[in-house]
Amino acid sequence: AQMVKNGTAFHHAGLDQRCRTIIETEYKNRHIKFLTATPTLAAGVNLPARRVVIPSVMRYTSNGLEKISILEYKQMCGRAGRPQYDDMGESIIISKGYPDEILEHYVDGEPEPLESKTLDEDSSLRINLLGFIYTASKFNPTSYEKIIKFFSQTFAAYQLSDDSVLEKKITKQLEKLKEYGMITDENGFEPTKFGIRVFYLRIDPKTAFDMTGYIEDYVRGTKHTFGILHMITNLPEFYSQYPVPDKYQESMDDLINKNEKLYRQQNFSNEDCFKSLLILYKWIDAMTYQDMSEHFDAEPGDIFYIKENAKDLAYTFTEIVKFWRDYAKENEQKKIVSEYQN
């Protein structure tokens, strides 16, 4: 707060929404003159930055220290001199050596070509396949040839430039969708009721299928809060994953031991989710944001996103549970009617 009073502030993903709104609003109103930021403001924002200073072209990633791409640099310096606020903008790179090379590479260089992820990532292809089959078979089942034709006209296929690889990838994921019970191909491809529900939930079909496995555990009587939270934090869509620091490992071990039966049944081994799992467990136990922030050494914004992400996935899980409950009731009713008619 003292920094903001003096016209300077910082901006990063760990800020809670209230602080973020204040900082962005006051920066737009030019009451904040100097703003340091992580890549949260590097692209897609329109702020009155007359000058952008990049202190280093190196950044820590999951693979260690790496150079930022030319595209990232262009996005960063593109924040300076927005037409709505200024008639010019300045971009400065702090060079720790080799200024000529940096000038040639970043300032004069061409941004890297864009790459489509539609065919690179199985989850993306599954989502798009299910979506196409649903929309293309509104009145009649769609054919394999139509599916191939559609995807062969995408930017991803253009970059792939190999029809045989395209067909191989699509065939593999069509088999997966059938395995998950989301499409049929008796007289062409069309979605099942489960497939339609998953399509509207906008989630990876594999994630939805994995959730049904937990429903089976629930029906068998294995049901408690820790298990649901554990399942949610292990999903690929749960992106706020942090390993547990050593000082919390004992608390995590106690939780696991108390819920050992379910933990072993789920067969999850991703320890990177454990800190998020502890935060969620304390959140539903009514621990305040401030206490959680101090206890887990986590920023309020990170805790907020962990909570919101978990809420979204919990909703998805609830909808899948509702679907299978209604589906089971419908099948039971059909069975009773059939027995009565016979």
Annotated model-derived regions:
Residues A1-F34, S62, E66-S69, K146-K149:
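Conserved C-terminal RecA-like helicase domain
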Residues M3, G7, E26-F34, P55, ...:
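Conserved, well-folded catalytic cores of nucleic-acid-processing
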Residues K5, Q17-T21, F34-T38, E66-C77, ...:
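Amphipathic alpha-helical transducer elements in NTP-driven molecular machines
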Residues H11, L35-T38, I54-P55, D86, ...:
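Generic beta-strand/beta-sheet core signal
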Residues R20-S56, G64, G78, P191-V198:
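Beta-edge loop/turn motif
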Residues L47, R51-T61, L65-V107:
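Conserved segment of the helicase C-terminal RecA-like domain
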Residues D87-L174:
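C-terminal or mid-to-C-terminal helical accessory/interaction module adjacent to the motor/catalytic core
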Residues R126, G131, T142, A157, ...:
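C-terminal helical accessory/scaffold domains
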